[in-house]
From Swiss-Prot:
Keywords carried by this UniProt record: Cytolysis, Host cell lysis by virus, Viral release from host cell
UniProt keyword Zinc-finger present: no
Biological processes annotated in GO: killing of cells of another organism
Entries under InterPro entries matching the protein: Micrvir_lysisE (IPR007605)
Keyword DNA-binding included in the entry's annotation: no
An example Gene Ontology molecular-function term: enzyme inhibitor activity
Pfam families (UniProt xref): Microvir_lysis
Designated name of the protein: Lysis protein
Function: E protein is responsible for host cell lysis.
Superkingdom as given in the UniProt entry: Viruses
Length: 96
């Protein structure tokens, strides 16, 4: 009968902790549906395409104001859902 040393047991547990998550991820079925939530989560590609397709308007905030006095201006960017597949991007610059 072979006896395990403490270093052997620790090495085995370390390897097991490294490989076990990847094995579990491999065998999780990909057909499961995500849980239903009241919050709508926007995926990154959808969000980035909405931002790229939004018409851009010049702001009254110059970059120099943000460089020299960032505490005097607030740049606000909001994304509002206007219909099922339509979003509006609102960008505003306000004084504190």
């Amino acid at each position: 009968m072979e006896h395990w040393t403490l270093s052997g047991i620790l090495a085995f547990l370390l390897l097991l902790s490294l490989f076990l998550p990847s094995l579990l991820i491999t065998f999780i079925p990909l057909t499961s549906k995500p849980p239903v939530s009241s919050w709508k989560v926007l995926s990154l590609p959808k969000t980035s395409s909405m931002v790229l397709n939004a018409p851009l308007k010049p702001l009254n905030c110059s970059p120099s104001l943000f460089l020299f006095a960032p505490e005097t201006k607030i740049l606000s960017v909001t994304l509002k859902q206007t219909s099922v597949n339509s979003y509006a991007l609102k960008v505003s610059c306000k004084d504190l």
